[in-house]
Amino acid sequence: MQRIGVFVCHCGSNIAATVDVKKVVELAAKEPGVVHAEDYQYMCSEAGQAKIQEAIKEKNLTGVVVCSCSPRMHEATFRKAAERAGLNPYMVEIANIREHCSWIHKDMEEATKKAVILARAAIAKVNLNTPLQPGESRVTKRALIIGAVLPEFRQPWISQMQDMK
């Protein structure tokens, strides 16, 4: 079983105005493997990242779930913070409760229910994750085309493939 920390961001009022952040923390704390759960105004800030790093070290966390905004925006931020604290960065999962809950729901109860579901899904994923290691593979610049090619497209393909040699 993993030792998971769950961190729920208010994103100022972006999330907290529609999602009951305290309720998400309370229910996430009861999930299997969760040994730490807390909320903070801006998890992506230096202070927010420091909270994650402190919890990783103090609670010996093996996985982290951040309930915040889009992974596209801050997944790298949280993975780097976890890595600086000694945690494999691929043991960090993001539950996008801003775009998927607070921005699309007007009803706080519905938005909160959905945020809890997303948090639980991310926690379940971390419980099943294993640390990954980045690697490199050699790539051979070849292609095999199977099927008929229209005559007007044939010549450009052949010349491009000959250039690859």
Which residues make up each language-model segment?
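Residues forming the flavin
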Residues: 1-165
